[in-house]
């Protein structure tokens, strides 16, 4: 049987590193279909830190796409697992027959599914991408994204799968000893990416709570984002006093980020699509409820796991937030499907499906 090849077709260092390390640590030892990777980006020590994997690096999307297409044409039994599919050339290859549906398995990351960019180039490309998506052999995604995808592509097979968020399961039962009274601290957004719509989110928080809460905005990723960070800072200072606005412009190490999240009382995410599962998982693990946009279908996954969900359209106050905290504290976090290690079973099944080992 031909070994499955995994494709990380865009240079997204943070997510690519997470996927590679997860496969190296959790999957490669037990499955030959979890070892072969083609990745856009620099090695930057990844080969050394992932010795169980065979990783081929490419300088850009186009060179990787050309190599994938060549392999697909040379052997029609060769199957590919695309982790987040932001590479236009690969979509066009699927549409034109360069890659066959039986070769194309896609794990939806969120941004690769929704059509939210307003640029002309994107507007022209979206219809072609939609046509190509009808030809995918199988999609893997969150419950909410599967539901969203099925509305336009009901005939494409869909399977539940969660991004392998880096988590320490031993923290599931750790009581959050933060004092749950007094001034609340609200986390706004999951990164410095513009998709978080930080300024609108800050205005929404201010409309709900005024200048009575402390707002923390993590913006250390992506790099070279100083102009936008300053734009958000100035908008924030028009709404909140300096002592109530904390904008983090430096990238935090994982443990420091975890400590930051545990100082919060609420997460506030205004984006109208599924994103930031990693941050949501870490907040939920710490007993911190989240406010989501109703257009973000991840609320379906949360309610399926009996987790409280607040919405940006709700009338929020401290009593409602404290009640959500109490509800979250009563949930057995060891049973949550999108937590580590529970998502591992979904990955083992996904590998078997993509490799053709199970129907």
UniProtKB/Swiss-Prot annotation:
InterPro entries linked to this entry: WecF
EC number(s) on file: 2.4.1.325
Any one GO molecular function term: 4-acetamido-4,6-dideoxy-D-galactose transferase activity
GO CC terms of this entry: plasma membrane
Reaction catalyzed: beta-D-ManNAcA-(1->4)-alpha-D-GlcNAc-di-trans,octa-cis-undecaprenyl diphosphate + dTDP-4-acetamido-4,6-dideoxy-alpha-D-galactose = alpha-D-FucNAc4-(1->4)-beta-D-ManNAcA-(1->4)-D-GlcNAc-undecaprenyl diphosphate + dTDP + H(+)
Coiled coil feature spans: none
Compartment(s) of residence: Cell inner membrane
Record's keyword terms, sorted: Cell inner membrane, Cell membrane, Glycosyltransferase, Membrane, Transferase
One GO BP: fucosylation
Signal peptide stretch: none
Pathway participation: Bacterial outer membrane biogenesis; enterobacterial common antigen biosynthesis
Record bears the keyword RNA-binding: no
Record-linked Pfam families: Glyco_transf_56
Family listed: Belongs to the glycosyltransferase 56 family.
NCBIfam families from the UniProt entry: PRK02797.1-1, PRK02797.1-2, PRK02797.1-3
Functional description taken from the UniProt entry: Catalyzes the synthesis of Und-PP-GlcNAc-ManNAcA-Fuc4NAc (Lipid III), the third lipid-linked intermediate involved in ECA synthesis.
Protein name: TDP-N-acetylfucosamine:lipid II N-acetylfucosaminyltransferase
The species this protein was found in: Shigella boydii serotype 18 (strain CDC 3083-94 / BS512)
Organism classification: Bacteria, Pseudomonadati, Pseudomonadota, Gammaproteobacteria, Enterobacterales
Encoding gene per record: wecF
